[in-house]
Design a protein with these regions (language model features):
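Extreme N-terminal, non-catalytic leader segments
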Residues: 2-14, 131, 139-194
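Residues at the beta-strand->loop junction immediately N-terminal to the Walker
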Residues: 30, 198-201
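Cofactor-cradling patches in redox/metallo enzymes
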Residues: 34, 41-143
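ATP-binding Walker
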Residues: 35, 200-203
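Canonical P-loop GTPase G-domain recognition
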Residues: 122-138, 142-144, 334-383
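Nucleotide-state-sensitive switch-loop elements of NTP-binding domains
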Residues: 136, 169, 173-192, 203, ...
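Long, well-ordered amphipathic alpha-helical subdomains in the mid-to-C-terminal portions
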Residues: 163-174, 369, 377-384
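Conserved C-terminal guanine-recognition region of P-loop GTPase G domains, centered on the G4
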Residues: 299-362
């Protein structure tokens, strides 16, 4: 008889620690420096999600500036920097300064990992709000994150005459999505182009969008008429705790992209895009000409996105089933064009053949997003 060696959930996982807060905490988890290990930070990410926190994981090899930009654009309550490479005294003050430079010196920095006891005082003196050494329990970390939350104010505090544009946009988006009161003078305008990218989980949507943004920003450097671009990436919210793991930034090299595009991750339940139209207007009002909207992609019902965007790209991959199965899903009806991603995988020819039966005059574009293949052609089609 089979035995259960481990329960599917634990008491820690089921406990929503954030229900009584003004809003669910938004925490940016990042690894600075050359440290290539992320198992520990992934454990923390899951624990935070299972506590009701919205966790943005930026991945390995981040610079202080890339983390600061991410925290600003995501309107984070706290940055949690994991350090394992003995560079905390060097990178810590650089991160604190970078937050000042990007207009969010008020975001506290928590640092954890291999931190010698003799360095803790120095870290606090340079502006690190909390330090967590090896052996700190997940309960203590979760409680510290909960304690970091403060009610959102409509206008970002700034030492200058006006807050940084991206910082203020991030706050406007947060308040809109959470049902709060946005400043009355927030500029609003629909971007020139609003492009939806949808498809099933694992189809490579995040990688595809990151490649599209890279190609777009390269073109915009030589053609100012394109303007700037932004991304809204939606991920599912836990039906049990209300937490979320927002991992779309993992696919983006922000060390190169920097401030050339605005990226924002948001968590929703099901297809609840109730705040999307208002957010789109805020993005356009902030001066972004093109907006890519990446959907949750949770299954057959991801169709409502078409109500909010100008063009919809449906991403498919080999092995998803024959034409009847794809037609049954209903999602093919909303496509303005089809993207056959992972075109180097077995079954690609069969996928394209089956799609031709339902595509009509709609374009079918083959891509290998991880290698950048087909991305220029896809962007041409989306901008046409």
């Amino acid at each position: 008889m089979a035995q259960t060696l481990q329960t599917a959930t634990s008491e820690f996982e089921k406990r929503d620690r954030c229900a009584a807060l003004p809003h669910r905490p938004r925490v940016l988890l990042g690894k600075m420096g050359l440290d290539g290990h992320d198992r520990g930070v992934k454990v923390i990410a899951r624990a935070m999600r299972d506590s009701g926190v919205h966790v943005i994981y930026s991945g390995l090899w981040q610079t202080p500036l890339s983390l600061a930009i991410s925290a600003r654009d995501e309107d984070c309550d706290v940055i949690a920097a994991s350090m394992m490479s003995n560079s905390h005294l060097k990178l810590g003050p650089l991160l604190v300064q970078a937050l000042r430079d990007v207009g969010r010196p008020d975001i506290p920095v928590y640092m954890g990992g291999i931190l010698p006891q003799e360095d803790l005082t120095a870290l606090r003196e340079i502006g690190i709000a909390r330090c967590f050494t090896t052996g700190t329990g997940l309960e203590d970390i979760a409680n510290a994150v909960v304690e970091s939350v403060r009610p959102r104010v409509p206008v970002i505090p700034s030492a200058n005459a006006a807050p940084h544009t991206a910082a203020q946009l991030a706050r406007d988006i947060s308040l809109t999505h959470e049902g709060g009161k946005v400043r009355p003078d927030a500029p609003r305008a629909r971007p020139t182009r609003v492009i939806g990218v949808t498809g099933s989980p694992g189809a490579g949507k995040s990688t595809l969008v990151s490649q599209l943004v890279g190609e777009y920003t390269r073109r915009a450097e030589g053609d100012s008429s394109l303007g700037r671009c932004a991304v809204l990436a939606f991920d599912p919210m836990s039906p049990i705790t209300g937490g979320a793991l927002l991992g779309d930034r993992l696919r983006v090299d922000f060390n190169r992209l920097g401030d050339k595009a605005y990226y924002r991750s948001l968590a929703i339940r099901g297809e609840d895009y109730a705040s999307l139209n208002a957010i789109i207007e805020l993005v356009g009002g902030a001066g972004y000409a093109t907006l890519f909207v990446e959907t949750v992609g949770a299954g057959q019902n991801e169709t409502r996105i078409r109500e909010h965007v100008d063009r919809t790209a449906v991403v498919l991959t080999p092995g998803m089933g024959d034409a009847v199965q794809m037609d049954k899903a209903g999602i093919l009806e909303i496509a303005d064009l089809f993207v056959c991603n992972k075109a180097d995988h077995p079954g690609e020819h069969e996928l394209v053949r089956d799609l031709r039966d339902v595509a009509g005059r709609r374009a079918i574009i083959e891509t290998i997003a991880t290698q950048g293949q087909g991305i220029p052609e896809l962007l041409d089609a989306l901008l046409a």
